[in-house]
Amino acid sequence: LILGALSAFGPLAIDFYLPGFPAMAQAFATDEKHIQLTLAVYFLGLSIGQLVYGPIADRFGRRVPLLVGVGLFTAASFACAFAPSLDWLIGARFVQALGGCAGMVLSRAIVSDKCDGVGSAKVFSQLMLVMGLAPILAPMLGGLLVNLYGWQAIFIVLTCFSALAALAVALGLPESLPANVPRQPLSGALRQYGRLLKDREYLGHALTGGIAMAGMFAYIAGSPFVFIQLYGVP
């Protein structure tokens, strides 16, 4: 249950607040392009954070980086809810992404630490179910919150959700990295990243996946304005 909640941080923080785009644009007296920056910056934070948390978790264990990440997500969600300006909101979204990707990365690492091949496959399938349901349910719940309480309510709910997740991690999730496993130096991760960047086959697959995802998220970023403002979907 805890790992499922942690793995849902990324999808929730993307799809949950999409229905609030038009209201946010009105609140900050700006256009849709500037509001969409809050989504682009979030993806930038996710990209950077995933490169960082893996090596740190291999060096220092899973629990402490996870608590730090969830704490960052909680604080940034609170800052988003009470952002006095669009620049503040964009900055808070970047920090929110840096914190949120800890749950996405380290929940998988914890499963690998605790389970064998068959057990890992079973748990990963359950985590994928959570990550698949979150983008489906989140926009509906987000739209309901925006209509009832305003766009700030979305980030208040994310603050409460992540605070409960942090408490659950602190009280119910022990360190999973075995003590007898050699701690990997951070320099080793940099060398591995360097080798990947020289691998043409890897770069080809990564570029293909990135282009495909770019098209999907271009639709996601523009769809709230189309459905709400053009078609009048409440």
Label every PLM stretch briefly.
Residues S176-A206:
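Juxtamembrane intracellular "pre-TM" segments in multi-pass secondary transporters
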Residues P84, W88, S125-L171:
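Helix-loop-helix hairpin linking two adjacent transmembrane segments in secondary transporters
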Residues I48-D87:
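Conserved MFS/SLC helix-loop-helix module at the cytosolic interface between two early adjacent transmembrane helices
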Residues A29, G61, F82-W88, G99, ...:
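Helix-breaking motifs and short loop linkers at transmembrane-helix boundaries and internal kinks
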Residues A92-M131:
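Cytoplasmic helix-loop-helix junction between adjacent transmembrane helices
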